[in-house]
Amino acid sequence: MRTLFNLLWLALACSPVHTTLSKSDAKKAASKTLLEKSQFSDKPVQDRGLVVTDLKAESVVLEHRSYCSAKARDRHFAGDVLGYVTPWNSHGYDVTKVFGSKFTQISPVWLQLKRRGREMFEVTGLHDVDQGWMRAVRKHAKGLHIVPRLLFEDWTYDDFRNVLDSEDEIEELSKTVVQVAKNQHFDGFVVEVWNQLLSQKRVGLIHMLTHLAEALHQARLLALLVIPPAITPGTDQLGMFTHKEFEQLAPVLDGFSLMTYDYSTAHQPGPNAPLSWVRACVQVLDPKSKWRSKILLGLNFYGMDYATSKDAREPVVGARYIQTLKDHRPRMVWDSQASEHFFEYKKSRSGRHVVFYPTLKSLQVRLELARELGVGVSIWELGQGLDYFYDLL
């Protein structure tokens, strides 16, 4: 009897089961039919007809990994190119090894500067420093400068007040920073501090940054500064860093990483960096083009996914963007005013979504603008983009 039961069970288990695919299952099955090239190309994207406004989702999925390996070290953009890499998007480390020659500076997001007491400072995050990666990058990209971002972290208003009002404090801060650069074989730093301090201490902050830059220069190191957009997004109001501050710091700093992205908000979905706003931010900073070569126009290699029914948004990096294209096969729309692509899709729970993410065309337009304005570019960040983006640089 038991043998008969086992045979019946085996027959049922092996018999075909006929079911109806749900809509979500059907989409998943359909997504498998979208192809992705895994091999490199012998031509850059500019020569393959891929830099277009009438973009198709299928084309992005098919081509995004297929960069031109033969020209991976050739530069197409003459200005300075700063690229950020982060520990949480490790693909950026690999990108830098392959395309390092296209950059003038690489800024790993490793370090924080903290005040521990009177005339006592510490640079934390050194556990993230990868000397082997630094050696590998420098080996393949001669002349490339590695300038980690140095974030002023956990500073209180009193910390700023005590430091900015004291030459001894500023001197100790500068010594600490220079010594870390020497010990770790850095070429300088990209300092991020401007957004952390209220406007009433700008004079003191300019003095401190000038002193720090002079100390770094004496050690043959570079000093760059992250700055917010000169025009507040969504308004015609000046931002926290204006022409006045730029004129004072431009002679002493080596570059300014201008954050020309994150224009739209969750409550007002839209482009990441409308072209007219990007242009205005540069022109307001330096209307007479005196120091334009030191401005590094910010390019976002990430996008935003807006859930319009919830007034919410989430950052979109390359892998998620490609998966969304596979799952929904949306119609890509070119916003000619902002010079960005976007698309819409629907989710059963969160309803309508709008996604703005950079494309070859939107990046090419911004690189052309940078050439026209005489500025460099800074990219946030290399691990978030698509591999074929780098053909443009």
From Swiss-Prot:
<comment type="function">
    <text>Saccharide- and LPS-binding protein with possible roles in pathogen sensing and endotoxin neutralization. Ligand-binding specificity relates to the length of the oligosaccharides, with preference for chitotetraose (in vitro).</text>
</comment>
<feature type="signal peptide">
    <location>
        <begin position="1"/>
        <end position="19"/>
    </location>
</feature>
<dbReference type="GO" id="GO:0005615">
    <property type="term" value="C:extracellular space"/>
</dbReference>
<dbReference type="GO" id="GO:0016020">
    <property type="term" value="C:membrane"/>
</dbReference>
<dbReference type="InterPro" id="IPR001223">
    <property type="entry name" value="Glyco_hydro18_cat"/>
</dbReference>
<dbReference type="GO" id="GO:0043202">
    <property type="term" value="C:lysosomal lumen"/>
</dbReference>
<dbReference type="InterPro" id="IPR017853">
    <property type="entry name" value="Glycoside_hydrolase_SF"/>
</dbReference>
<dbReference type="GO" id="GO:0005802">
    <property type="term" value="C:trans-Golgi network"/>
</dbReference>
<comment type="similarity">
    <text>Belongs to the glycosyl hydrolase 18 family.</text>
</comment>
<dbReference type="GO" id="GO:0005634">
    <property type="term" value="C:nucleus"/>
</dbReference>
<comment type="subunit">
    <text>Interacts with STAB1.</text>
</comment>
<keyword id="KW-0391">Immunity</keyword>
<keyword id="KW-0399">Innate immunity</keyword>
<dbReference type="InterPro" id="IPR029070">
    <property type="entry name" value="Chitinase_insertion_sf"/>
</dbReference>
<dbReference type="GO" id="GO:0070492">
    <property type="term" value="F:oligosaccharide binding"/>
</dbReference>
<protein>
    <recommendedName>
        <fullName>Chitinase domain-containing protein 1</fullName>
    </recommendedName>
</protein>
<dbReference type="GO" id="GO:0005975">
    <property type="term" value="P:carbohydrate metabolic process"/>
</dbReference>
<dbReference type="GO" id="GO:0005764">
    <property type="term" value="C:lysosome"/>
</dbReference>
<keyword id="KW-0732">Signal</keyword>
<dbReference type="GO" id="GO:0008061">
    <property type="term" value="F:chitin binding"/>
</dbReference>
<dbReference type="GO" id="GO:0005576">
    <property type="term" value="C:extracellular region"/>
</dbReference>
<dbReference type="InterPro" id="IPR011583">
    <property type="entry name" value="Chitinase_II/V-like_cat"/>
</dbReference>
<dbReference type="GO" id="GO:0070062">
    <property type="term" value="C:extracellular exosome"/>
</dbReference>
<dbReference type="GO" id="GO:0012505">
    <property type="term" value="C:endomembrane system"/>
</dbReference>
<dbReference type="GO" id="GO:0005770">
    <property type="term" value="C:late endosome"/>
</dbReference>
<feature type="domain" description="GH18">
    <location>
        <begin position="79"/>
        <end position="393"/>
    </location>
</feature>
<dbReference type="Pfam" id="PF00704">
    <property type="entry name" value="Glyco_hydro_18"/>
</dbReference>
<dbReference type="GO" id="GO:1900016">
    <property type="term" value="P:negative regulation of cytokine production involved in inflammatory response"/>
</dbReference>
<dbReference type="GO" id="GO:0045087">
    <property type="term" value="P:innate immune response"/>
</dbReference>
<keyword id="KW-0458">Lysosome</keyword>
<keyword id="KW-0964">Secreted</keyword>
